[in-house]
Every structure is written in structure tokens, then in C-alpha cells.
């Protein structure tokens, strides 16, 4: 165990309609395979209410790029129009060609084929080291019991993997 996130708090998520908005955020590991050596991709549905950050639902697995985009759709369907949702994807300078040449065409194709409104904005904000950001932003919330993982998703393999990622963090 890493120690930074020794305890994980699970709790009931308020009705989605109570959130002013929700964010779907994805981190697309490079690669187009499901082997044990490939990196994991993740897409999370997050909401903040009354000082608490809720991890409402997540997908965390090795997978294909089209599956990664499909996770956004599943999360949008889960919200079901109960509140506004903003969709973002990690997109630093190194990832931008991948975002433009691989993900955007997949999103456009799916939007056209399914006649759905799916728009993912690349998060191009220059950031510090990921580990530093996690420790600085999420650890204090977690320590105070204000980082809440959805108890209804506790047995979901994706949420289990996310909780494990937190516990391994050091």
C-alpha cells in the first residue's frame, strides 16, 4: 500500500439533478490493445457538491480507443439529461496529434452514425507532474472525508480498480 490514500471513503451520491453540472474526464493511455503490458485508460464521471467531490462512476481498463470513447457515451447515458455534462480528455502537447488524428475522427464517426451529441474538449492546460497534482488536490479532500466514491459502484470491477489505484499511490 502506498499510504497517501490509506482510507477510501464510499458514500451515497446525491441525485444527479442536484449537481449544477458534472464532468466526464478521460485519460487515454496510448496503445490499441488489451495486453497486460499495455497502459490503462480511464474515464470518470465526477461532480462537486457542498465541498465534496464525488466519483460517481468510472471506467478503468486496458482497451481499444473506440471502447474508450464508448465509455463517454455510457456515462452520458447514465446521466440521462438530469444535469449539464462537460466532457474533457487529457491532451497535452505530446498527446495532441493522437487526440486530433485518432480520437476526434472516432468521436465524429460515432456522432454521425448514432446521431448523438458527443463533444469532447481536449484539456490542454499546462500541468505539473500528475503525482504532485493528485497528492496536492485529492489527498486533502480524501483526508477530510470529502472525496467520495459512489457506494452503489463499490462492487463494479472498474471502481474496484480505481480504489486500488488510490491505495497504491505513494
PLM segments and residue spans:
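An active-site-proximal beta-strand-loop segment
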Residues: 26-43
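Mg2+-dependent endonuclease catalytic cores in nucleic-acid-processing enzymes, primarily RNase H-like
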Residues: 49-169
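Structured core elements
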Residues: 24-25, 45, 88
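Short regulatory "switch" loops immediately downstream of catalytic or recognition motifs
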Residues: 7, 31, 106-107
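ATPase catalytic-site recognition across NTP-hydrolyzing enzymes
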Residues: 1-28
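Flexible internal linker/loop segments at domain or repeat junctions
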Residues: 13-18, 47-53
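Short, conserved, surface-exposed binding loops centered on an aromatic residue
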Residues: 11-17, 32-37, 74-81
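Short, well-ordered turn and helix-capping elements at secondary-structure junctions
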Residues: 28-32, 59, 170
Amino acid at each position: 500500500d502506498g499510504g497517501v490514500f490509506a482510507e477510501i471513503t464510499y458514500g451515497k451520491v446525491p441525485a444527479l439533478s442536484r449537481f449544477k453540472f458534472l464532468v466526464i474526464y478521460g485519460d487515454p493511455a496510448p496503445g490499441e490493445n488489451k495486453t497486460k503490458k499495455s497502459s490503462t485508460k480511464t474515464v470518470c464521471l465526477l461532480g462537486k457538491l457542498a465541498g465534496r467531490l464525488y466519483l460517481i462512476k468510472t471506467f478503468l481498463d486496458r482497451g481499444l480507443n473506440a471502447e474508450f470513447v464508448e465509455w463517454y457515451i455510457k456515462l452520458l447515458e447514465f446521466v440521462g439529461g438530469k444535469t449539464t455534462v462537460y466532457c474533457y480528455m487529457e491532451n497535452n502537447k505530446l498527446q495532441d496529434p493522437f487526440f486530433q488524428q485518432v480520437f476526434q475522427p472516432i468521436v465524429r464517426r460515432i456522432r454521425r452514425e448514432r446521431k448523438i451529441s458527443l463533444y469532447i474538449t481536449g484539456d490542454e492546460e499546462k500541468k505539473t507532474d500528475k503525482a504532485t497534482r493528485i497528492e496536492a488536490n485529492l489527498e486533502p479532500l480524501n483526508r477530510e472525508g470529502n472525496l467520495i466514491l459512489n457506494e452503489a459502484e463499490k462492487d463494479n470491477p472498474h471502481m474496484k480498480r480505481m480504489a486500488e489505484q488510490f491505495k497504491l499511490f505513494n
